[in-house]
Amino acid sequence: MSSHAEPTPVARNRKPLTLPALRAMQQRGEKIAMLTAYESTLARVADEAGVDTILVGDSLGMVVQGHASTLPVTLDEMAYHTRCVARGLQGGAAWLVADLPFASYHQGPSQAMAAAATLMQAGAQMIKLEGGGWTAETVRFLVERGVPVCAHLGLTPQSVHALGGYRIQGRDEAGAAELRRQATELTQAGAAMMVLELMPSAVAAAVQADNPQLMTIGIGAGPATAGQVLVVHDMLGLTRGKLPRFVRNFMHSEAGQNLSVEDAIRAYVAAVKDASFPDPVAHAYASAS
């Protein structure tokens, strides 16, 4: 059985986004809407719905492959899904970011460069890597060689066992200070963008204030970041089980109507842009008192 839909790229109404264009969005106070995608059709829908940045996340290990964590995902699998998404974005506008999976960059800059090259040759325009100060040398090495880098602090799922599970990071004073220190170190190393995951809103706000040139993208980090990201399966209500409090199901409108996938993604983009999502109470976390 096959689809008979026309596979060729269609014209979009937006100009392709670049790193300078994303920076300009931040400078004029426009929020950046990021969303995950793992295959071409949904990537195209997300692009047409106005998503600014598509993330081919190693979260595919959980929501696509059915694993309990992101750890089993391989570089070859990330490259495959990146190629799929890149084909869906042909003729589109969204900026494409791809995750370096576990153990593909941990041995140092040279290994990271080889892995980054694989993903960029597959169509990525920026690579994302998890980790604190120990990744600064690698970030600098990649940026000096023309690879745009998105860092990732807070809850880093590839370190789930070391962290003792999916727990909020930086809730106490010492933890918050360490996250701020690491964020500044990675920014100085050249990271242009940074995902801040599962941390108190005040900590994420401080990271952004410390590094005004950094494009912070929050997920469970409150409303003060330069943008937001969600896993597409979560915001479409496809994920089963208990979801984190920062997730909102956009398949249902505020008026109680059921939306199409494209309209749900449009609603997500609009909510990010007008700062109605995330809610500073319902979708956020506070520091320990």
Swiss-Prot record:
What CDD domains does the record point to? KPHMT-like
One of the record's GO molecular function terms? 3-methyl-2-oxobutanoate hydroxymethyltransferase activity
- Entry's InterPro entries? Pantoate_hydroxy_MeTrfase (IPR003700), Pyrv/PenolPyrv_kinase-like_dom (IPR015813), Pyrv_kinase-like_dom_sf (IPR040442)
Q: Per the UniProt record, which residue ranges are transmembrane?
A: none
Keywords recorded for this protein, A-Z: Cytoplasm, Magnesium, Metal-binding, Pantothenate biosynthesis, Transferase
Record EC number: 2.1.2.11
Q: What are the positions of the active site?
A: 197
The name of this protein is 3-methyl-2-oxobutanoate hydroxymethyltransferase
What organism, scientifically named, is this protein from?
Answer: Leptothrix cholodnii (strain ATCC 51168 / LMG 8142 / SP-6)
Q: Gene of origin?
A: panB
